[in-house]
């Protein structure tokens, strides 16, 4: 649970203050065990230290919402799943321990006769309360704070070391203390993995696992009275289960990660050659645009030729209508001139058509050149404007020539009449 709202200084100070207060209170509260008159295997007064330390840190430091993020009491499907694991894993540890006792010793101790002068229900309630106050401080508060700056695995290591120091027992010698340290550290690592990704819903899981472990050990083993073989069996069994559970969890998460990534790549493949495909598509689009421009230019050339034909027909109609105005004049010589003019117009039309075709070819060549230089738009507009201008100029020249020919014919007719 990464949350960078808490500064690095406050994060470090919170962890330090919590640990110092917890250790100091655990030393001071030892004297109250005999005062309250409760046997230590029912309820350890020193276990109140983490709860008190957590409350003090919450009151002293700011960002209360972040500090209380691991103290949610709601239930989810994942919490129920982890609660089942919190009951199954202690059972597996106890089964391994009992099998080890039967294999390497005569038998395990069942319902010890020493120190069990109280009802079992009192012991069960006492262990549930001990588990709650300890895990409230270490898992629901401290691990939540540590996870704001590091992932769950490393946060579990940090909290596990602190919890092992808090639970250290040097009364029965160094070897006993070493195995007790291994047991409590493995115990804490399992708890850290159990509460992973529960979004602050940690207290039920941690309390269930803690109470199940301590309650079973009271009745099956005698490590609380300093038996070295018992603590050795418990420590090794817990370490084996911790390694197996955490390793299996990592493998499952790794497989899930790879499967999810593969599915995402199938949906949206990360193709590093996409830019090549984009270039090919761009070139294809440009080629299509170029061919379309060439076709438009050819159509423009054809329309120019048809325009010339229209101008020719208009000129012929004008020339044909003019002699009808002078029906009294002689028709031989004007008709001869009209035929010559018509032939001249046909020659001019042929020249104009040739020029139009040449103009279309030049436009086509110009468009192809412009497409290679990425300047097709401006040249296309210019090339489309030129045939239209040329059409207007040629039509005007043909009409002017026809008018001049008519005037000349009228003059010749008037001279002959005279």
From Swiss-Prot:
Sequence ranges of Basic and acidic residues compositional bias: 282-299, 323-353, 379-418
Pfam families to which the protein is assigned, alphabetical: Rce1-like
Topological type in the membrane: Multi-pass membrane protein
GO CC annotation, single: plasma membrane
Highest taxon of source: Bacteria
Main location: membrane
Subcellular location(s) of the protein: Cell membrane; Secreted, Cell wall; Cell septum
Biological processes per GO annotation: CAAX-box protein maturation
Region (Disordered): 274-418
GO MF, any single term: endopeptidase activity
TM stretches of this protein: 9-29, 41-61, 84-104, 118-138, 153-173, 175-195, 202-222, 231-251
Entry keyword Cell membrane: yes
Keywords in alphabetical order: Cell membrane, Cell wall, Membrane, Secreted, Transmembrane, Transmembrane helix
Family note: Belongs to the LyrA family.
The protein's role, per its UniProt record: Involved in bacterial cell envelope homeostasis. Regulates peptidoglycan processing by N-acetylglucosaminidase SagB, perhaps acting as a scaffold protein. Pleiotropic regulator of gene expression, probably acting via interactions with multiple two-component systems. Plays a role in the abundant deposition of the immunoglobulin G-binding protein A (spa) at the cross-wall, a subcellular structure that initially arises from cytokinesis.
Domain notes per entry: C-terminal region not involved in glucosaminidase activity of the SagB-SpdC/LyrA complex.
Subunit annotation: Interacts with N-acetylglucosaminidase SagB; interaction is direct and facilitates peptidoglycan processing. Interacts (via N-terminal region including transmembrane domains) with sensor protein kinase WalK (via N-terminal region including transmembrane domains). Interacts (via N-terminal region including transmembrane domains) with sensor protein kinase SaeS. Interacts with other histidine kinases, perhaps via their transmembrane domains.
Protein name in the entry: Lysostaphin resistance protein A
Lineage of the species this protein comes from: Bacteria, Bacillati, Bacillota, Bacilli, Bacillales
């Amino acid at each position: 649970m990464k949350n960078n709202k808490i500064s690095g200084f406050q994060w470090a100070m919170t962890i330090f203050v919590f640990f110092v207060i917890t250790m100091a209170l655990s030393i001071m509260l030892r004297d109250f065990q005999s005062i309250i008159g409760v046997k230590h295997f029912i309820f350890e007064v020193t276990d109140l230290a983490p709860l008190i330390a957590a409350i003090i840190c919450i009151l002293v430091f700011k960002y209360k919402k972040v500090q209380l993020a691991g103290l949610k009491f709601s239930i989810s499907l994942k919490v129920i799943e982890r609660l089942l694991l919190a009951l199954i894993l202690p059972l597996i540890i106890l089964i391994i321990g009992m099998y080890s006792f039967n294999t390497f010793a005569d038998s395990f101790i069942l319902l010890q006769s020493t120190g069990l002068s109280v009802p079992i229900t009192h012991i069960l309630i006492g262990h549930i309360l001990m588990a709650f106050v300890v895990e409230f401080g270490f898992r629901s508060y401290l691990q939540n704070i540590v996870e704001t700056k590091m992932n769950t695995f490393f946060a579990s290591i940090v909290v596990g070391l602190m919890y092992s120091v808090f639970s250290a027992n040097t009364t029965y010698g160094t070897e006993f203390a070493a195995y007790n340290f291994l047991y409590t550290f493995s115990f804490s690592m399992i708890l850290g993995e159990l509460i992973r990704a529960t979004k602050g819903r940690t207290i039920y899981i941690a309390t269930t696992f803690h109470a199940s472990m301590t309650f079973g050990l009271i009745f099956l083993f005698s490590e609380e009275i300093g038996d070295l073989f018992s603590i050795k069996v418990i420590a090794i069994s817990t370490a084996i289960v911790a390694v197996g559970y955490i390793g299996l969890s990592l493998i499952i998460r790794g497989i899930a990660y790879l499967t999810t990534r593969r599915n995402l790549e199938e949906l949206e493949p990360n193709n590093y050659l996409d830019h090549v495909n984009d270039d090919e598509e761009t070139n294809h689009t440009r080629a299509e645009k170029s061919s379309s421009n060439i076709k438009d230019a050819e159509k423009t050339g054809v329309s120019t030729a048809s325009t010339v034909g229209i101008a020719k027909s208009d000129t012929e109609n004008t020339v044909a209508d003019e002699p009808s105005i002078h029906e009294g004049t002689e028709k031989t010589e004007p008709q001869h001139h009209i035929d010559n003019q018509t032939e001249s117009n046909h020659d001019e039309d042929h020249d104009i058509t040739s020029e139009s075709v040449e103009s279309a070819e030049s436009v086509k060549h110009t468009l192809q050149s412009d497409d290679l230089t990425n300047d097709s738009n401006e040249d296309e507009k210019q090339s489309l404007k030129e045939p239209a201008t040329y059409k207007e100029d040629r039509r005007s020249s043909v009409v002017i020539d026809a008018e001049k020919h008519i005037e000349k014919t009228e003059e010749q007719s008037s001279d002959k009449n005279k």
